[in-house]
From Swiss-Prot:
Subcellular location: Mitochondrion inner membrane
Annotated source species: Saccharomyces cerevisiae (strain ATCC 204508 / S288c) (Baker's yeast)
Record Pfam families: ATP-synt_10
Keywords annotated in UniProt: Membrane, Mitochondrion, Mitochondrion inner membrane
Entry-linked PANTHER family: MITOCHONDRIAL ATPASE COMPLEX SUBUNIT ATP10
GO biological process, one term: mitochondrial proton-transporting ATP synthase complex assembly
A molecular function (GO) term: unfolded protein binding
One CC-aspect GO term: mitochondrion
Keyword Membrane assigned: yes
Function: Essential for the assembly of the mitochondrial F1-F0 complex.
Family: Belongs to the ATP10 family.
Gene name, Swiss-Prot/TrEMBL: ATP10
Additional detail: Mutations in ATP10 induce a loss of rutamycin sensitivity of mitochondrial ATPase.
Primary location recorded for the protein, binned into one broad class: mitochondrion
Name assigned to this protein: Mitochondrial ATPase complex subunit ATP10
């Protein structure tokens, strides 16, 4: 009888113990903590330069499941991800209005700066898929990143009402102003991180139909799958909240030299464009 009990119930107990190892630490940190808006001081990004062969992994391989150090590290990652899921983004956005962090007062030095991640996207003008880093390499780039209508609106504020030669400029509506950036070797790259291919096609079709994105912006306006960047990668860029919008100043070597999010303040707009033309 005792042998029968072990035969039928021991595997179940083992599985429960295995799951318990994962669930306990996750549940302990699952309740959202009071969000604090802090100023960026340390560089953000990845330590490895992006390559076309780069693929960011999410989770552990079967072999890693038997490595206690890697397993414990993954459990901690999952705990953070779990604590920031569901209504967390909504609650934080409502509280901060998308201002998840305050931009640094100066740009990060080249030897300290970290890299913008590898990303594949399709330009709105219908060209084939390409690596975003190929577009960034060799130019100073201002990358506008968003996933929702609110993020689109917030991130647009960094390009509107820019004072240049004593007049206000809008780099998203004025083609001549956009073209003039070439004189400073500066370009604007727009990235719409979408959840899936169906949504991507819908976004592209509606944007064209509404003539929201003029033809001169379309070669630099990309739809990219958000799934290419796992939670951990987005966390390194401080861009996990889908409701906000983000701006990254990326140098010619693909390093992030400055970043901002939410609606632009006058000082942030001034800093962004001053830094962009200085790099």
């Amino acid at each position: 009888m005792q042998g029968t009990f072990k035969r039928f119930y021991h595997p179940t107990l083992t599985r429960m113990s295995f799951l318990d190892k994962f669930l306990k630490p996750m549940m302990a940190t699952a309740s959202p903590k009071e969000y604090q808006i802090k100023q960026l001081v340390k560089p953000i990004g990845l330590t490895q330069a992006p390559r076309k062969s780069t693929k960011y992994s999410q989770g552990n391989s079967l072999r890693d499941m038997f490595d206690s150090e890697k397993t414990n590290h993954r459990v901690k990652e999952l705990a953070v991800e779990f604590s920031k899921s569901g209504l967390y983004d909504v609650q934080v956005f409502q509280k901060t209005k998308g201002k998840l962090f305050i931009a640094p007062v100066s740009y990060w030095k080249e030897d300290k700066a970290l890299f913008f991640p590898h990303l594949i996207g399709t330009a709105m003008d219908g060209t084939k898929q390409q690596n975003i880093e190929d577009m960034l390499r060799g130019k100073t780039s201002i990358v506008r990143l968003f996933s929702t209508a609110s993020g689109d609106k917030l991130s647009s504020s960094y390009f509107q009402g820019i004072v240049d030669d004593n007049k206000k400029t809008d780099y998203l509506t004025e083609a001549d102003a956009r073209l003039s950036l070439n004189d400073s070797n500066v370009q604007i790259i727009e990235v719409n991180l979408v959840e899936n291919a169906v949504k991507s096609a819908l976004v592209k079709t509606l944007a064209r139909w509404a003539n929201r994105v003029p033809s001169w912006r379309q070669p630099f306006y990309f739809e990219c799958s958000r799934g290419q960047w796992p939670f951990s990668v987005r966390e390194e860029l401080f861009c996990n909240n889908v409701f906000s919008g983000y701006v990254f100043l990326v140098d010619q070597q693909l390093k992030i030299r400055w970043a901002a999010c939410g609606e632009a303040t006058p000082s942030e707009k001034e800093a962004l464009w001053k830094f962009a033309k200085r790099l």
